[in-house]
Amino acid sequence: MSKKKTKKVLTPEQKKKRIRNIIIVAVILVAASVATYWMQPQNKALAESEVFSEEEVKAQAEKIIGLLNAEDFDSLQSLVVPDMQEIMNKERMDEGKARISEDWGDFVSIETMQDAEIIQRGAHIAAVYVTAEYENIEVHYTLAFNEDMKLASFGIQ
Protein backbone atom coordinates (compact mmCIF):
# COMPACT_ATOMS: atom_id res chain seq x y z
CA MET A 1 0.00 0.00 0.00
CA SER A 2 1.38 3.29 -0.96
CA LYS A 3 0.42 6.46 0.75
CA LYS A 4 -0.31 9.34 -1.47
CA LYS A 5 0.65 12.74 -0.22
CA THR A 6 -2.17 15.09 -0.57
CA LYS A 7 -1.56 18.76 -0.89
CA LYS A 8 -3.30 20.73 1.80
CA VAL A 9 -5.43 23.44 0.29
CA LEU A 10 -5.35 26.73 2.15
CA THR A 11 -8.30 28.97 2.42
CA PRO A 12 -7.86 32.63 1.39
CA GLU A 13 -7.90 33.61 5.07
CA GLN A 14 -5.11 31.11 5.87
CA LYS A 15 -3.06 32.41 2.93
CA LYS A 16 -3.40 35.99 4.19
CA LYS A 17 -2.39 34.92 7.68
CA ARG A 18 0.66 33.04 6.36
CA ILE A 19 1.75 36.03 4.23
CA ARG A 20 1.28 38.38 7.19
CA ASN A 21 3.43 36.12 9.40
CA ILE A 22 6.17 35.96 6.76
CA ILE A 23 6.17 39.77 6.49
CA ILE A 24 6.34 40.15 10.28
CA VAL A 25 9.31 37.75 10.51
CA ALA A 26 11.07 39.56 7.64
CA VAL A 27 10.59 42.96 9.32
CA ILE A 28 11.90 41.59 12.63
CA LEU A 29 14.98 40.13 10.90
CA VAL A 30 15.72 43.42 9.12
CA ALA A 31 15.29 45.39 12.36
CA ALA A 32 17.58 42.98 14.23
CA SER A 33 20.20 43.26 11.48
CA VAL A 34 20.09 47.07 11.58
CA ALA A 35 20.33 47.09 15.39
CA THR A 36 23.28 44.68 15.34
CA TYR A 37 25.09 46.79 12.75
CA TRP A 38 24.43 49.95 14.77
CA MET A 39 25.83 48.36 17.94
CA GLN A 40 29.01 47.12 16.26
CA PRO A 41 31.97 49.51 16.57
CA GLN A 42 32.87 51.20 13.30
CA ASN A 43 36.53 52.23 12.98
CA LYS A 44 38.07 54.75 10.66
CA ALA A 45 41.24 56.79 10.46
CA LEU A 46 41.16 59.84 12.68
CA ALA A 47 42.30 61.96 9.72
CA GLU A 48 38.91 61.18 8.10
CA SER A 49 36.92 62.19 11.19
CA GLU A 50 34.26 64.87 11.00
CA VAL A 51 34.24 65.14 14.82
CA PHE A 52 37.91 65.14 15.85
CA SER A 53 41.06 66.90 14.71
CA GLU A 54 43.92 64.39 14.49
CA GLU A 55 46.43 67.06 15.57
CA GLU A 56 44.32 68.08 18.56
CA VAL A 57 43.89 64.47 19.70
CA LYS A 58 47.63 63.76 19.44
CA ALA A 59 48.45 67.01 21.27
CA GLN A 60 46.00 66.09 24.05
CA ALA A 61 47.57 62.61 24.35
CA GLU A 62 51.06 64.16 24.60
CA LYS A 63 49.81 66.63 27.21
CA ILE A 64 48.30 63.87 29.35
CA ILE A 65 51.43 61.71 29.14
CA GLY A 66 53.49 64.80 30.06
CA LEU A 67 51.31 65.46 33.11
CA LEU A 68 51.59 61.80 34.15
CA ASN A 69 55.38 61.93 33.80
CA ALA A 70 55.46 65.14 35.87
CA GLU A 71 53.05 63.55 38.38
CA ASP A 72 50.83 66.64 38.06
CA PHE A 73 47.58 64.91 38.91
CA ASP A 74 45.83 68.14 39.93
CA SER A 75 46.16 69.54 36.39
CA LEU A 76 45.16 66.16 34.97
CA GLN A 77 41.78 66.23 36.74
CA SER A 78 40.38 68.87 34.37
CA LEU A 79 41.27 66.73 31.34
CA VAL A 80 39.44 63.54 32.33
CA VAL A 81 35.77 62.58 32.55
CA PRO A 82 34.29 62.61 36.08
CA ASP A 83 34.27 58.80 36.32
CA MET A 84 38.05 58.75 35.76
CA GLN A 85 38.95 61.50 38.24
CA GLU A 86 39.03 59.16 41.24
CA ILE A 87 41.43 56.72 39.62
CA MET A 88 43.79 59.19 37.94
CA ASN A 89 45.98 59.80 40.99
CA LYS A 90 49.56 59.11 42.07
CA GLU A 91 48.70 56.00 44.08
CA ARG A 92 46.88 54.28 41.20
CA MET A 93 49.52 55.32 38.66
CA ASP A 94 52.30 53.99 40.89
CA GLU A 95 50.42 50.67 41.14
CA GLY A 96 50.05 50.51 37.36
CA LYS A 97 53.67 51.44 36.73
CA ALA A 98 54.90 48.82 39.22
CA ARG A 99 53.02 46.09 37.34
CA ILE A 100 55.07 46.91 34.26
CA SER A 101 58.46 47.59 35.85
CA GLU A 102 59.82 48.86 39.14
CA ASP A 103 62.27 51.25 37.45
CA TRP A 104 61.11 53.05 34.32
CA GLY A 105 63.86 55.63 34.43
CA ASP A 106 63.36 59.11 32.98
CA PHE A 107 61.07 59.79 30.05
CA VAL A 108 63.02 59.90 26.78
CA SER A 109 60.49 60.39 23.98
CA ILE A 110 57.27 59.40 22.30
CA GLU A 111 58.23 56.94 19.60
CA THR A 112 54.96 56.34 17.75
CA MET A 113 51.30 57.33 17.84
CA GLN A 114 48.55 55.41 16.09
CA ASP A 115 45.02 56.74 16.11
CA ALA A 116 41.49 55.88 15.06
CA GLU A 117 37.96 57.08 15.47
CA ILE A 118 35.57 54.52 16.90
CA ILE A 119 31.84 55.02 16.42
CA GLN A 120 29.54 52.81 18.47
CA ARG A 121 25.86 53.35 19.28
CA GLY A 122 26.12 56.85 17.85
CA ALA A 123 28.97 57.89 20.16
CA HIS A 124 32.30 59.00 18.69
CA ILE A 125 35.55 58.15 20.48
CA ALA A 126 39.08 59.14 19.47
CA ALA A 127 41.54 56.38 20.41
CA VAL A 128 45.32 56.80 20.46
CA TYR A 129 47.91 54.07 20.95
CA VAL A 130 51.20 55.65 22.05
CA THR A 131 54.59 53.99 22.35
CA ALA A 132 56.80 55.96 24.75
CA GLU A 133 60.44 55.33 25.50
CA TYR A 134 61.82 55.65 29.02
CA GLU A 135 65.44 55.04 30.05
CA ASN A 136 64.80 51.46 31.13
CA ILE A 137 61.60 50.40 29.40
CA GLU A 138 59.24 50.94 26.49
CA VAL A 139 55.68 51.71 27.58
CA HIS A 140 52.47 51.48 25.54
CA TYR A 141 49.66 53.84 26.45
CA THR A 142 46.09 53.51 25.21
CA LEU A 143 44.04 56.69 25.53
CA ALA A 144 40.45 57.27 24.46
CA PHE A 145 38.81 60.69 24.32
CA ASN A 146 35.14 61.59 24.18
CA GLU A 147 33.76 64.27 21.86
CA ASP A 148 34.62 66.94 24.46
CA MET A 149 38.27 65.83 24.31
CA LYS A 150 38.14 64.52 27.87
CA LEU A 151 40.07 61.35 28.67
CA ALA A 152 37.43 58.62 28.93
CA SER A 153 39.64 55.52 29.02
CA PHE A 154 43.28 54.91 29.86
CA GLY A 155 45.58 51.92 29.88
CA ILE A 156 49.31 51.22 30.16
CA GLN A 157 51.25 48.14 29.18
Regions found by a protein language model. Give the residues of each.
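Alpha-helix termination/capping residues and helix-transition junctions
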Residues: 70, 104-107, 148
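Core segments of small alpha/beta cavity-forming domains
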Residues: 51-93
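Extended interaction regions within the primary functional domain
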Residues: 1, 17, 79, 134-136
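Exposed beta-sheet edge and beta->alpha loop/turn motif
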Residues: 114-157
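Short solvent-exposed beta->alpha transition segments
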Residues: 77-124
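Short secondary-structure boundary micro-motifs
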Residues: 11, 20, 49-51, 68-70, ...
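Short, low-complexity N-terminal intrinsically disordered segments enriched in polar/charged residues
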Residues: 10, 17-66
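Juxtamembrane low-complexity tails/linkers enriched in Ser/Thr-Pro and polybasic
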Residues: 3-15
